[in-house]
Amino acid sequence: MSWQAYVDDHLMCDIEGHEGHRLTAAAIVGHDGSVWAQSATFPQFKPEEMNGIMTDFNEPGHLAPTGLHLGGTKYMVIQGEAGAVIRGKKGSGGITIKKTGQALVFGIYEEPVTPGQCNMVAERLGDYLLEQGL
């Protein structure tokens, strides 16, 4: 299966039990900032934004004072899982980033999708990739 198929079929799919509800954008990005696959709606990000995200995984709390920036959008960092998951909120939407051994799985949402649904979608694929040694 191609990386694009993982994004299309496992991240940008209808949320289980909520037909028509799906993430706004999603991507799988290597730890080095290289995009493995992304939805057409995923924002163009700057290298320094990806560096900040990677630093927060290695030094949890790094982004809390300044917020998480992706594609020029600022998200307030909310409770995540140190070294494993970063979650952010902006207005009626937000972001979940799950770290695997080699990649970051991004899910971005807006209402009516809930934070919990975004977490479930992004983290489920991230957990699967971890199980595969990726």
From Swiss-Prot:
Cysteines paired by S-S bonds: C13-C118
InterPro entries: PFN (IPR048278), PFN_euk (IPR005455), PFN_sf (IPR036140), Profilin_CS (IPR027310)
Pfam (any one): Profilin
Domain of life, source organism: Eukaryota
Motif Involved in PIP2 interaction: chain residues: 84-100
Annotated GO CC locations: cell cortex; cytoskeleton
UniProt PTM comment: Phosphorylated by MAP kinases.
Residues where Phosphothreonine is found: T114
Major location (coarse): cytoplasm
Keyword list, A-Z: Actin-binding, Allergen, Cytoplasm, Cytoskeleton, Disulfide bond, Phosphoprotein
Localization of this protein: Cytoplasm, Cytoskeleton
PANTHER family: PROFILIN, PROFILIN-5
Family indicated by similarity: Belongs to the profilin family.
Protein name per Swiss-Prot or TrEMBL: Profilin-3
Organism: Olea europaea (Common olive)
Name of the coding gene: PRO3
